[in-house]
Amino acid sequence: MRDVLEQCDFLAAVFDMKAHRVSADFAIMTYGDQVFQLHSDGTYHSNPLRGLLPENPPRGAGIEIRLYDTDPEDAVQRAIATGAVILVDPTDKPHGLRKAYILCENGYAWVPSTQL
């Protein structure tokens, strides 16, 4: 993450995630009974993954973080209020989900969805 604190604020505002042990370099986020870890780019100084991060956008390309049982309409409205990019408005899908695609500042696609 470019900015862990900003990402924590985004996830709390849009998805009601709870932040724990927050610092500029690290945070634990909870979403229901799921746990996420956020790390700043700087914490990867000796990690081989660091060499894979592009210096220029796009970042996060190809990853979708799916959050089931999250109302896509509500999440989209909250995301708009944060200035996030809505890639796909809430849409009914033939596989039985209603979902949206929200792009955060760090370039990750967050996909809130509910069953139809």
Predicted segments, located by residue:
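Conserved beta-strand-loop-alpha-helix junction that forms the acyl-donor binding cleft
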Residues: 1-3
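Conserved active-site tyrosine of GNAT-family acetyltransferases
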Residues: 7-12, 79, 107
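Vicinal oxygen chelate
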Residues: 17-70, 74-103, 114-116
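Short glycine-/small-residue motifs
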Residues: 109-112
